[in-house]
Amino acid sequence: MISAVYAQSEAEGILNRHRRIFSAFKNYVILSSTGGTAEPSPPSAAKREFMEHRNWNKNNIRTSLLGYGCMRFPTKADGTIDEARAEALLNTAKAAGVNYFDTAYPYHNGQSEPFVGRVIAKWDRSSFYLATKMPLWNCKSLDDAKRIFEEQLQRLGVDYIDFYLLHSLHKARYEKAKAMGLVDWLWQ
């Protein structure tokens, strides 16, 4: 019974911390993908203290608890990314202390990575962590995977990717990735 009470108390504490972070974040960012304008302004220094970060034990990495997913940016009527609004959202998130940005090869019909690359080119590369994903369904061989990886570096305009994930991974795809040598190549 005591451990159940402790676990509930611990869970409530975690939820309250996340509510505080989100509350501080939502006060100055408008997250809208349809209609209206999104003109978020950077937070004051006082608001930045609300973003919590965690250190990764075995690496010199410190990521924000809140990451920014780049799958659903605001779009224009023709379906393309509304770059002014989306850039304002990314800049606001970064100013609020978010330092983990996640995109992928197929997001926004292949336009998320190039757009994110144009935005992050204006930032100090050491101020954020970038994640993207290998589209395993496009890989028939290790050479395909290497070509796609190099293409992603170019699309993002970076020399390295901090977190490289395998997209839509399930057991069969993982086994295929292992068989083609992709898993071993990624661990090098």
Ranges and model annotations:
Residues 71-73, 104-106, 133-137, 166-169:
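Active-site beta-loop-alpha junctions enriched in small/polar residues
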Residues 13, 35-36:
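Residue-identity detector for glycine
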Residues 2-14:
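Extreme N-terminal basic, low-complexity initiation segments
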Residues 28-30, 37, 41, 47:
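Short, positively charged and aromatic/hydrophobic N-terminal segments
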Residues 77, 139-188:
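Glycine/proline-rich, positively charged
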Residues 33, 45-128:
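N-terminal binding-site loop/beta-alpha segment at the start of enzyme catalytic domains
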Residues 4-7, 19, 24, 29:
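Short hydrophobic alpha-helical segments enriched in small aliphatic residues
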